[in-house]
């Protein structure tokens, strides 16, 4: 039998429609929780609470510098975390900026559910097991 793959993923998306698309695509693997508006401290706190090992960050041209800085900041604080950027797949600048900031991969909004789930499965196999920190002092 297959192992229990129920995980929690965090996502910063453009809107509720994009969040719902991501939740639908990843429903067989776990739950996708909105990480709010993109505050670094808020995102890091959610990672600690949910033990998420994968975070989706939506990118757009209007906020690209701040979104790239967010990816860099998260990875500086939590280097073992995997970041997957979301955005317009036809916009090469978004893809390049995501990779330069340290994202592991890029997914175009509206991609097929099987593609998104396959990507998450592959990334999850490469990530270290996340265990709760029992030393909270």
What are these regions (language model features)?
Residues 2-26, 35, 56:
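Conserved acidic segment of CheY-like receiver
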Residues 31-39:
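Short hydrophobic/Thr-rich beta-strand motif most characteristic of the beta2 strand and flanking loop
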Residues 42-43, 53-74:
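Conserved phosphotransfer microenvironments
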Residues 75, 96-100:
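Alpha4-beta5-alpha5 "output face"
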Residues 80-90:
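A short, hydrophobic beta-strand element within the central beta-sheet of small alpha/beta folds
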Residues 111-119:
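C-terminal output helix
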Residues 130-137:
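Walker A (P-loop) phosphate-binding motif
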């Amino acid at each position: 039998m297959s192992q229990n793959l129920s995980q929690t993923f965090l996502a910063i998306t453009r809107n509720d429609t994009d969040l719902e698309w991501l939740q639908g695509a990843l429903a067989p693997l776990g739950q996708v929780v909105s990480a709010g508006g993109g505050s670094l401290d808020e995102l890091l706190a959610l990672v600690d609470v949910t033990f998420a090992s994968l975070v989706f960050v939506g990118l757009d041209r209007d906020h690209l510098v701040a979104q790239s800085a967010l990816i860099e900041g998260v990875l500086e604080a939590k280097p073992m975390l995997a970041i997957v950027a979301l955005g317009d797949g036809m916009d090469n600048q978004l893809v390049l900026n995501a990779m330069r900031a340290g994202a592991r991969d890029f997914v175009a909004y509206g991609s097929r559910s099987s593609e998104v789930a396959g990507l998450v499965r592959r990334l999850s196999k490469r990530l270290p097991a996340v265990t709760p920190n029992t030393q909270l002092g």
